Amino acid sequence: MKKIFYIFAVGYFVASCSGLPIQTKLEAYPAMYDDRKPLSVLVIPAINNSTAAEATDYFNVTITEPLSNVGYYTMPVEIVKDIFLKEGIVDSSMIKGLPTTIFKKNFGADAVLFVTINKWDKQYIVLAGNVTVSMDYVMLSTETSEIIWQYSATQTIDTTAESSGFIIADLISTAITTATTDYVPIAKQANFQAFTALPHGGYSDQHGLDGNQSISTTLKDAALDDEG
């Protein structure tokens, strides 16, 4: 049976032990609580820096639901992708340099969310195996271009097979389990966990009430600076 380990940049105990900075949501993301707070978020298809070509597709089908669940209106990512394709934009890295006001004018979005997939890996070493997904999230205001929310999330699933007492059988079982792991629930959980650190939006009954919740902030401010 699979043993699942979640490694997230949340949780007071873990953050305290590792020295990660602890803040409330209001302290970390004040723009999400004042007049600049977004109601609608345009999600850009992920920038894929991993070695898995299919990673963006897994992201596209798992991002909208958890974002909607915390109170934000959003458009399906596949529709957004098709719109940009018709404009000749085939890579999301091309979108990062655009003025954010374009997203307000053309989509009516209050904020735009960029996600970078850093890792989407299967690792298999002798009798041990695991699958790791790691993503960075940066949300910008479409009016001011300022970063109003940012976060990172990593999830690792241990795919090591339980010992049967036969090394060859265990080796084969671990290899098969690692190779056939379903990425969709992994991606969905990573997105869900990231949005636990996102202040609730205007369509949630928790809107404006979660400012005192503690979170750890670990995402690099350079998340949008990799292209200069």
Locations of the language-model features?
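N-terminal post-signal-peptidase region of extra-cytosolic proteins
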Residues: 25-29, 94-100, 119-124
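C-terminal motif of bacterial Sec signal peptides marking the signal peptidase cleavage site
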Residues: 13-16
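Positively charged n-region of N-terminal signal peptides that target proteins for export
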Residues: 1-4
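Mid-length scaffold segments of soluble, non-membrane domains
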Residues: 105-120, 126-130
